[in-house]
Amino acid sequence: MYWEDEKDENTPYVVPDDVVDLVYRINCRSLPLDHAHSFSTAIRDHLSWIDEEERAGIHLIHGAESGNGWMRPDDASNELLHLSHRSRMTLRVPKHRIEDAHTLSGRKLDIDGHSLEVGKANVKLFSTLPTQFARYVVVPEGLGQEDEEAFMAYAVEQLRELGINVRKLLCGRGHAIRHPDGDVHTRSLMLADLDVEEAVTLQQRGIGEHRAMG
């Protein structure tokens, strides 16, 4: 016999802490706008275990997309990202690696000639908001980088494998990230109308490759 009790809607959902975000203070004036590969390499030089952890990830550092007349340029090859004292660096790590990741505090990283000093980190649990946004989801090999419909079908398949019921999915603009082996093509994705468990699962497991590059 199989018997599943209904959920108690009055019981508050507790966000699990088996995977968390570590949000670091940083001291850095500027970075190359396209810093994905060099930043990832610098982090992994100190935290080599990241490649062994399926649920670990490195978030890219972002300034404002727009503001004061400045728009993030499409050609990032010679552009700089100017950072403020409020800028932060975020790593996604499993719980058993939190202490290991704290050893990054106090280090100075060289990101293509730009110095980044890593400060203290705070643990941040995942969001339960029904709308989640990913800036960069890698377009898999075999899909045309301009084929939005094929990419959407790929994303839906990946999400369903995670047990996520896709209700509203919006595909955004494409973006190429420089890599020594050739550009990595990505697209942004927004999911809406997620329930809390789906929102957390999506952040825990994610979709796409190159999570150590943002």
Regions found by a protein language model. Name each.
Residues M1-G214:
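RNA-interacting cores
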